[in-house]
Amino acid sequence: MSNTRICVKQLPKHLTDKRFKEHFEKFGTVTDAKIIKKDGKSRLFGFIGFSTEQSAKNALSLNGTFIDTSKIVVETATVASETTENRPWSKYSIGSSSNKRLTEMEKEKEKKELKRKQDKLEQQSNKKQKKSHTNSLLDAELENDPEYQEFLNLVAPQANRKVWENDDKEIGKINRGEEEGEEGEENDNQVEDGKLPFSGKKKIELDHGKNKDLLVFEDADASDEEDLYEDMPTAPKKQNKKDDVDSIINEKKKKHDSSVSDLDWLSKFRSNNDEIIEKNQSIVYRDEEESEEEDVNNKENKKDKMKIDDNKENKKEKKKDKKKNKKDNDNDGDDDESKIKPIKYFEHDYTKEDEDVGESGRIFVRNLSYSTKEEDLEKVFSKFGKISEIHIPIDYDSKKSKGIAFILYLIPENAVQALNDMDGKVFQGRLIHVLPGKAAPAKQFSENKDNNNNGAEGGSSSFKAEKEQKQKTTSGSTHNWNALFMRSDAIVSSLAERYKMTQGQLLDPNQMDLAVRMTLMETHVINETKKFLEDQGVIIQDIGNKGSKRSNTVLLVKNIPFKTQEHELHELFSKFGELSRVVLSPARTIALIEYIHPNEAKVGFKNLAYSKFHHVPLYLEWAPEGVFKLPAPPKEIKKSEKSEKSSDSSNDKKEVESTTKTAATTTTTKKGTDNNTQFVYIKNLNWKTTNETLVGKFKSLKDYVNVNIATKANPKNPSERLPCGFGFIEFSSKQGAYECIKKLNGSSIDGYEISLKLSDKNETNVQEINKRRELPENSKQSIKSNGGQPNKPSSKIIIKNLPFESTIKEIRKLFTAYGEIQSVRIPKKPNGGHRGFGFVEFLTEEEAKNAMEALGNSHFYGRHLVLQYAEQDKNIDELREKANLDYEKIKNSTF
């Protein structure tokens, strides 16, 4: 895609879109100007779109300039979807040098942090090793200390001690300490009561999961947590140590006593677990009830919300019913149902209305520039495949584009490719959006119903209606187009009125050569029409060329009756749009209609093709592109020209009558040039220079008339025209031409220094030069039959599409009017009939050329004659030389 969009940064905060656009308008047509904003505040950058790439390149020269006191940065804008993105620069963007340095620094920090943690762990491990070493030494020293071992046994919690762990040790101690046995018995009694030797304390069990015994004071509250973790009391004197040990041993003996029942033994270890469990269960039950209540409340709230939404929806439906003034009384039932049914949202059913772009082949393009033309879209989208139709909707009040377009491809797969590739791309300075398009509406405008009924008495049959419908659908096909087709009755009526004869006298059915005379009369009227169209500024050579590109505003109207008037055609075609000009030939057999806007021309073509006009169907055809030399004059000039034409009408009629008498023996002549008209030759033009650029350069000169750049056909794409690098400027006087050369010779246009001089050949039409660079239509058709080379002019003509009723006598009489005929030959079939083609050989090449130009658009027995140069017969010397070569080959060959 072309770079037609630029990005401007560092804009002033106070800059408006209007002023932003005006600042860049001097470089070309601005199609889009937008300052990016957030929350109503400028983000200090914006985008400018131009219609041409050259304008965008010229606008880049403002880079580094100032708007007010802000130095702006101007650069080419890039699309986010393009793969060729700029190199990242932010430290947060992957791939930038700043981001690389930042990641390296972070990696180094991580390494240092990891090393620091490892060192710290090593230090801690060393400390632990030292501590464990010292502890091992202390343990070794204290292992044999009996007092220390007794202390450890007493300090250790009961849960961590096994019942049988110290039985042997305790028994040994009892033997050694019999003297203190009495004190041990007293302590045993205290342990049986569930109390420790120190007063004021009792044992309770709170944690039912781990069965841990905790000590609590008797006079302390249960909620006092500090008392639970109070320090143990100081140990009694040494004389009580043996008593404590004896009490513990006695308790263990009682635990192992067989006389004690299991229930009594287990009752000692019973704690408050049951109470805690009951409390927890009550809490659980209460939580479940509360959660159920909350669920019920939530459901009720949801129902209330649904009712509110349903009520709102019902109110909206009632308002719609009031606006539409419906008389149905079913609204109450619908409202009741809406309370139960869930809310429904509108969903567009694409499956019914929108076809898949792979089937329809039609795409929808939006956000186009309002100056976009069909030719611009065709250049861009034709690279994906052949385009059948391009439609740009317009506003019929302003006659301007709406910024959208529909493109129909001949092959649907090409539309899919265009949709994927062109969506979001820049076109003429705007980001276009390509979407699948709906199928074209199959509606037709029915006009002149009364005229249609007149065409067939009693109404048209189904077969006839089907045939007419088929003709309308194929009206855009070029296979049956014939630019200069004329009705036979219109030709006869025109000549009969001109020579003041009846049609019967003119035709004279008693004579045998009626078909020949009819063809000659048609040729006479065609030549007369060609001369008239040339006078009206029509390039007649383009009309018969089927390979030329077609216009989208000019229509050729054929098969019209002789009584047709110009105002009738204007009234008929102006129903579908504004006309710029209407050209009707003097014989009233063919007309040219030009619309101002292409869309209106398309509507007129579709609705009037094969429609009844008076009593005959209209044959419409798109005229070749550039068929008019000059654009249509304004309406005020047309009125002044009409008065001039009325005064010269008598002289024109005399000239027409004098030329028609000799039309059969002469060919169409070129329009003579005015003696005062002068042409200036321009060379060394830039390949990108257009006619509009030259017009802007030379229109201010004295006696300026017109300017044209010579073009040639593109070998790769024959429908495309390429500039030749030179052109011609037309002046109405020699003085204006000399003044142009004196002032502007050596000046520069688009960066190229041009050279001006008077034209040697004094060409009146640059299109004639362009035509010389193209192959003629007849020669193009005969390339394949001549070894890939076009046929050269010769005195022999081949006639194709001959009617089977024709005879050699009729063909000789038809061509005798254009020169002396040397021979006529029609190849025949074995059954006696001819094969549909023949050969006519004239005495000179000039006579053959006259016959081809005169009869190239004529009809014989209703068939269009196709004329081409035939290959010249070889003379006797060439035949002898060929025979000698063949004889030598046979002689030298071995059998």
Curated annotation (Swiss-Prot):
- One GO term of the biological process aspect: rRNA processing
Record-linked Gene3D superfamilies? 3.30.70.330
**Localization in the cell:** Nucleus
The answer to whether UniProt assigns keyword Coiled coil to this entry is: yes
Locate the compositionally biased regions of type Polar residues.
Answer: 778-794
* Record field: compositional bias (Basic residues): 317-326
Residue ranges annotated as compositionally biased, kind Low complexity, are: 451-462, 659-670
The residue ranges of the RRM domain are: 4-79, 361-439, 553-625, 678-761, 795-872
- Give a yes or no for keyword Nucleus in this entry: yes
Coiled coil start-end = 96-134, 284-331
Question: One Pfam family name from the record?
Answer: RRM_1
Extract the InterPro entries matched here. Nucleotide-bd_a/b_plait_sf, RBD_domain_sf, RBM, RRM_dom, RRM_dom_euk
Q: Name one GO molecular function term.
A: mRNA binding
Sequence ranges of Basic and acidic residues compositional bias = 101-113, 241-251, 265-278, 296-316, 635-658
Family per record? Belongs to the RRM MRD1 family.
**The protein's name in its UniProt record:** Multiple RNA-binding domain-containing protein 1
